[in-house]
C-alpha cells in the first residue's frame, strides 16, 4: 500500500485524484489508517495547529521526528511524508542531507517535503534523490518564508510572479521531486503548472485542476471555529461536538450521575 510509484504515479495525472491529509498524532493517524486516504503528511504546520505558535518557524527537527514517529505508529500502512522544518536544510547541502537522513531513519517516514524552488533547493533535491531520499516539493505560499512574503498571502498573482513560479516548478520537476504541493496560488496558475510538470501536483488553495488535494485534518474536521481561509471546506463541526460532550461530562460528574454502576468495579 505504500508504493510511491502506485500512489504518486505520473500516469494518474488527469485521471485519478490523490488525497492527502496532514496529521500530527497517533490517535488521528490510527483512524486515517482505516480510510482510503492515499497519503499522510506530517507538516511543520504543527507549530501553529498543535503548538499554538503564529508561524511554522519555531518547529525543530527533533519535534518533527517526535510527531512523525507517533503518526507512523498509528498509520503503518500509509505513505508517510514528513516536512523538513525551517533551517534544517537551508544552510548547506550537507545539513540538508543530514536532516533528511535523520528524520527518515528515526521516524520511518517514506519521504520528506522541502519548500522552495531556488537553484540551491533543486540541487539538494537532486542529491537527495541520488542517495535514495524521495522528495516532495512545495511552491506558492511557502510558510517558512512567511516574513519574506509579508504574511499568508496568495502568491503568483502577477505576470512576473506567476512566470517565476512556473519556472521553479519545472526546475523542481527536472531535479527529481516525485510530487509537489502548490499552496495558495490562482487556480489558473495551478492548472498551468499541473499541465507543465510530469509529476502529480497536490493543491491547497490552488484550484481543482491539481492532481490531488491536501488539507490539515484538524481544519477539515472543523476543530477551530476561528480558522476559515477561503480554500478550506469543513467536512464536520468537531468543535461543537467536542464542546457538547465535555459539557455533558461536566454535568454528569457534578450531578453524581457519572460514574454509575456500569462504570464501577
Curated annotation (Swiss-Prot):
GO terms for molecular function: 3-methyl-2-oxobutanoate hydroxymethyltransferase activity; magnesium ion binding. Keywords: Cytoplasm, Magnesium, Metal-binding, Pantothenate biosynthesis, Transferase. It catalyses: 3-methyl-2-oxobutanoate + (6R)-5,10-methylene-5,6,7,8-tetrahydrofolate + H2O = 2-dehydropantoate + (6S)-5,6,7,8-tetrahydrofolate. It is found in: Cytoplasm. 3-methyl-2-oxobutanoate binds at residues 44-45, 83, 113. Its main location: cytoplasm. Pathway: Cofactor biosynthesis; (R)-pantothenate biosynthesis; (R)-pantoate from 3-methyl-2-oxobutanoate: step 1/2. Mg(2+) binds at residues 44, 83, 115. It is an enzyme of class 2 (transferase). The keyword Signal does not apply. The active site is at residue 183. Binds 1 Mg(2+) ion per subunit. The keyword Metal-binding applies. Its cofactor is Mg(2+). GO terms for biological process: pantothenate biosynthetic process. InterPro entries: Pantoate_hydroxy_MeTrfase, Pyrv/PenolPyrv_kinase-like_dom, Pyrv_kinase-like_dom_sf. GO terms for cellular component: cytoplasm. Its EC number is 2.1.2.11. Belongs to the PanB family. Homodecamer; pentamer of dimers. Catalyzes the reversible reaction in which hydroxymethyl group from 5,10-methylenetetrahydrofolate is transferred onto alpha-ketoisovalerate to form ketopantoate. This is 3-methyl-2-oxobutanoate hydroxymethyltransferase. The gene is panB.
